[in-house]
UniProtKB/Swiss-Prot annotation:
GO terms for cellular component: cytosol. The active site is at H96 (proton acceptor). Bifunctional enzyme with both catalase and broad-spectrum peroxidase activity. Belongs to the peroxidase family. Peroxidase/catalase subfamily. Homodimer or homotetramer. GO terms for molecular function: catalase activity; heme binding; metal ion binding. It comes from Aspergillus oryzae (strain ATCC 42149 / RIB 40) (Yellow koji mold). Residues 1-24 are annotated as: Disordered. Its cofactor is heme b. Heme b binds at H282. This is Catalase-peroxidase. The gene is katG. Gene3D superfamilies: 1.10.520.10, Peroxidase, domain 2 (1.10.420.10). Its EC number is 1.11.1.21.
């Protein structure tokens, strides 16, 4: 029986360097705090005081662009350029860097250079992009830290377009590299490449390696109605968007259009932008499927040391050039694959299309009764008939896409402008506000998806004004906890993923944020009314043009309330405050895009409950990661907000104190009190009741977002620091520091 052991003859696993059975192997559902410890100075090799913006601005930008332009036609023997031009490859590299972005949590995208790391560097959709980045290395090496990989990959895509005759909309630098894989992103629950059995209720199990998906239409009749799991924006594990062969490999252009519309919308693209991107991008280059994927070796993360980070070694022919295998599809869209023109759209409507197979066995389409006039990438004596992908034909056979495609065909200038704008949005959507943009090619035009905020056009309030305004705020008669809740509600919309949200703009007073359940509209309205009255009184009294924005007042009111709460608890402390925020208008606020930022849960305010899949404490950690908080910062903020009585609905859950409204460490003291016994209250496991162990009398109620700080070993260790007798002062100091951090997360104008 020994020969049937599943581990028989397997090489022993390493027993050093963190190998062996890990905690997550024993307890796979354990709350993971690792995502709160990423991208710190520990993993960053650059000097702590390195200023990337200053380094980028010292770059000879146009010399860099010239070097990139020259690279486009400098074909290398080790990885030859299709048609003698790397443009198509580099467009794909930039697209796939930016195209992982999704709107629900702002994660993904090209803003951190994550394509260099697992899993993205080994996704089936990113085959051969390891070569693209290696082609760029001599240029990255030349310019060093003056340009990040994140910026370089996007800029190279721009230069590729320009080198083939397309006028781009512009380019903004400012993407800082990270130095490790971002483990905060949920890419899906599938365990095989190209699978979608988790993201769809009747999905496809996938395969163990990249290549053509074997279609089985009988098993996938829901492709016209299925719903993609949130927050995902890709139809298969390891793909950027959709399966180019069609849903689950079924060559159905209409069903494919449904997948396209869903995935592109989740990346913030409307139908016109979607058509422009597909038709514009497929004007250039080709796909690669010279033979079966059986010839293709392991992805970079599974390749041997000698491969030096390259993957997908190809045993077919030379393994490169004409023998390249990437997607398994073999399509060159136009007769001029290195020039911008209308050929893609012209062919789309000129020909009738017949289903065929690529040399690798993938579903694709060939023009019926057409002559062979498409050039071969490596043999000038060869010509091919026009071919298309299933997802290309979606632009013709989906009624809405067809209407847009025909308009673009009849109006070339509209097509070019739409593609330029959509490409800029694709490659800059995750950069946040324009204040982060740097470089000489930043477009002057302000775009609605950039969440614009007016520039400061008046003197800001002084220290004397700040002190007077604090007194006015505390004299309004509004419970200070409402000012704290309002400030938190405003600032905590920030997402470190795509740099959206935050207190600047005061969008908390506008639709849709003012109506979010978590913001408790009656309480919010009372706080805002009091602050608006103070704003009107202050501004009308000025004769030198000085103004205070509501955005500044919202944050200042929260700071004043925190200072009062600390003082009431016996601690005199000043909460840092920097004026200069401005108020956005409703016209500057895209309601639909902001609706996607509405929190499902906010454990800092004890809002939301567990789902069948996600316990509430996991939502709390996810929120903390989006706020760029460490585990200690998350801990001290939750404990402080409970003491300050800042639950979204005014409930007593987690308010473990007899003096709510004072900034005390009572939350931790009472949470750690062994005289309290906890049990679930009611039928669910979201609300708990704490009783006195001796008398059985009820003492407290709590949520999972409260009790996790006593249950989770690492969080309990932090809680013990703040719950100790000598932890009171440290608690107040650390709370104020973490509070100030959150209030200023979006202040790219001063940070």
């Amino acid at each position: 029986m020994a020969d049937k052991c599943p581990f028989h003859n397997q090489a022993p696993k390493p027993n050093v360097a963190g190998s062996g059975t890990q905690n997550r192997d024993w307890w796979p559902d354990q709350l993971k705090l690792n995502i709160l410890r990423q991208h710190t100075t520990v993993s960053n090799p650059l000097d702590p005081d390195f200023d990337y913006a200053a380094a980028f601005n010292s770059l000879d930008y146009y010399a860099l662009k010239k070097d990139l332009q020259d690279l486009m036609t400098d074909s290398q023997d080790w990885w030859p350029a299709d048609f003698g031009h790397y443009g198509g490859l580099f467009i794909r590299m930039a697209w796939h860097s930016a195209g992982t972005y999704r709107t629900f949590d702002g994660r993904g995208g090209g803003g951190q250079g994550q394509q260099r790391f697992a899993p993205l560097n080994s996704w089936p959709d990113n085959v051969s992009l390891d070569k693209a980045r290696r082609l760029l290395w001599p240029i990255k090496q030349k310019y060093g830290n003056k340009i990040s990989w994140a910026d370089l990959m996007i800029l190279t895509g721009n230069v590729a377009l320009e080198s083939m005759g397309f006028k781009t909309f512009g380019f903004a630098g400012g993407r800082k590299d990270t130095w490790e894989a971002d483990e905060s992103v949920y890419w899906g629950g599938e365990t095989t490449w190209l699978g979608n059995d988790v993201r769809y209720s009747h999905g496809f199990a996938g395969s163990s390696k990249h290549g053509a998906v074997i279609a089985d239409e009988a098993s996938h009749r829901d492709i016209h109605s299925r719903e993609l799991e949130k927050p995902l924006a890709a139809a298969h594990m390891g793909l950027i968007y959709v399966n180019p062969e069609g849903p689950d490999g079924n060559p159905d252009p209409v069903a494919a259009a449904r997948d396209i519309r869903t995935t592109f919308a989740r990346m913030a693209m409307n139908d016109e932008e979607t058509v422009a991107l597909i038709a514009g991008g497929h004007t250039f280059g080709k796909t690669h499927g010279a033979a079966s994927s059986d010839h293709v070796g392991s992805e970079p993360e599974a390749a041997g040391l000698e491969a030096q980070g390259l993957g997908w070694q190809n045993s077919h022919g030379s393994g490169k050039g004409a023998h390249t295998i990437t997607s398994g599809l073999e399509v060159t869209w136009t007769k001029t694959p290195t020039q911008w023109n209308l050929n893609f759209l012209e062919y789309l409507f000129r020909f009738e299309w017949v289903l065929t197979k690529s040399p690798a066995g993938a579903n694709q389409w060939v023009a019926k009764d057409a002559d062979a006039f498409i050039p071969d990438a490596y043999d000038s004596s060869k010509k091919h008939r026009p071919q298309m992908l299933t997802t290309d034909l979606s632009l013709r056979f989906d009624p809405a896409y067809e209407k847009i495609s025909r308009r673009f065909l009849e109006n070339p200038d509209q097509f070019a402008e739409a593609f330029a704008r959509a490409w800029f949005k694709l490659t800059h959507r995750d950069m946040g506000p324009r204040a982060r943009y740097i470089g000489p090619e930043v477009p002057a035009e302000e775009l609605s998806w950039q969440d614009p905020i007016p520039a400061v056009n008046h003197p800001v309030i002084s220290e004397t004004d700040i002190a007077a305004l604090k007194r006015d705020i505390l004299a309004t008669g509004v419970d200070p906890s409402k000012f704290i809740s309002t400030a938190w509600a405003s600032a905590s919309t920030f997402r470190g993923s795509d740099k959206r949200g935050g207190a600047n703009g005061a969008r908390i007073r506008l639709a849709p944020q003012r109506d979010w359940e978590v913001n408790n509209q009656p309480w919010l309205a009372a706080a805002l009314k009091a602050l608006e009255d103070i704003q009107d009184k202050f501004n009308s009294a000025q004769n030198d043009g000085k103004r205070v924005s509501l955005a500044d007042l919202i944050v200042l009111a929260g700071c004043a309330a925190v200072e009062k709460a600390a003082s009431d608890a016996g601690h005199i402390i000043t909460v840092p405050f920097t004026p200069g925020r401005m108020d956005a208008s409703q016209d500057q606020t895209d309601v639909e895009s902001f609706n996607q930022m509405e929190p499902v849960a906010d454990g800092f305010r004890n809002y939301g409950t567990s789902t069948a899949r996600v316990p509430a404490e996991h939502y709390l950690v996810d929120k903390a990661q989006l706020l760029t908080l460490s585990a200690p910062e998350m801990t001290v903020l939750v404990g402080g907000l409970r003491a300050l009585n800042a639950n979204y609905d005014g409930s007593a859950h987690g308010v473990f104190t007899t003096r709510p409204g004072q900034l005390t460490n009572d939350f931790f003291v009472n949470l750690l009190d062994m005289n309290t016994s906890w049990k679930a209250s009611g039928s669910g496991n979201d609300i708990y009741e704490g009783t006195d162990r001796r008398t059985g009398s009820k003492k407290w109620t709590a949520t999972r977002a409260d009790l996790v700080f006593g249950s989770h070993a690492e969080l309990r260790a932090i809680a013990e620091v703040y719950g100790s007798s000598d932890g009171k002062g440290k608690f107040v100091k650390d709370f104020v520091a973490a509070w100030a951090k959150v209030m200023n997360l979006d202040r790219f104008d001063v940070n």
